[in-house]
Design a protein with these regions (language model features):
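Post-His helix in hydrolase/transferase enzymes
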Residues: 185-199
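Conserved loop-alpha-helix segment in the C-terminal half of the alpha/beta-hydrolase fold
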Residues: 141, 145-179, 185
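Gly/Ala-rich beta-loop-alpha elbow adjacent to hydrolase catalytic centers
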Residues: 36, 40, 44
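Glycine-rich phosphate-binding loop signature in dinucleotide/nucleotide-binding domains
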Residues: 24-30, 141-142, 198, 202
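Conserved alpha/beta-hydrolase catalytic His-Asp/Glu region
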Residues: 69-71, 84-142
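Flexible "cap/lid" loop of the alpha/beta hydrolase fold
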Residues: 45-50, 55-86
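Conserved catalytic-core motifs of eukaryotic protein kinase domains, centered on the activation segment
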Residues: 2-8, 69-72, 159-160
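Active-site loop/oxyanion-hole signature of alpha/beta-hydrolase fold enzymes
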Residues: 1-35, 193
Length: 203
């Protein structure tokens, strides 16, 4: 994004939405299915509110309407802290102990590769700008089907928070066993057991 090089990158809701909609328009996609995890699980809620007629379905992984503060994100971009290692450590702690170590390490490695301050900037959306609050009540599942799947091992977007979100929308949530915050990458084989039935409903 413009000005990211000077260290003030902050992912906003409007920018995030614009990137997704520009991608869809650029490829001339007609009512695609969008799936997002973590911050992606949050943005699908905004898409459901603002563009329900544009999607065939929306799938949220580890979705929650807001995030209760649990650590100081300033640690993610400081001169006296190795940003890659601390970002990787945070990601690792969000994964289930039952997920394969090789897949967990690969997921952690992705987070260790981010540019300075990028993860911190992404979390600006996740922790602050993207919080939905009472706007959740505007989501109409009859206009666009929404599916919420959350791993049982996640202190960021907990199953309880996703359940509360699902109850507000008036849908069922799917609780996934043996996975954490990154189901598709930390334990893909286990995740597909839950995803395939959802995709079969959509198609």
């Amino acid at each position: 994004p413009e000005n990211a090089q000077v260290g003030n990158y902050k992912l906003s809701t409007d920018f995030y939405i614009s990137q997704i909609m520009s991608f869809i328009d650029g490829l001339e996609l007609i009512k695609p299915v969008v799936m997002g995890c973590s911050i992606g699980g949050r943005i699908i809620l905004h898409l459901a509110i603002n563009f329900p007629d544009k999607f065939r379905a929306l799938i949220g992984l580890q979705s929650a309407g807001h995030l209760d503060p649990y650590y100081d994100i300033s640690w993610l971009h400081r001169q006296d802290v190795h940003g890659g290692e601390v970002c990787g450590g945070i990601a690792y702690g969000l994964m289930a102990p039952t997920s394969p170590e090789s897949d967990k390490f690969e997921t952690m490695w992705h987070y260790m590769q981010g540019g300075p301050g990028i993860f911190k900037g992404d979390l600006f959306f996740y922790k602050f700008d993207g919080n939905i609050g009472n706007e959740i009540k505007k989501i109409d599942n009859s206009k666009c089907p929404i599916y919420l799947l959350t791993g049982e091992y996640d202190y960021s977007a907990t199953p309880e928070e996703t359940k509360s979100l699902a109850d507000t929308i008036g849908i069922e949530m799917i609780k996934m066993k043996n996975v954490g915050h990154f189901p598709m990458s930390e334990n893909p084989k286990e995740f597909l057991k839950y995803l395939h039935p959802v995709l079969n409903k959509i198609i």
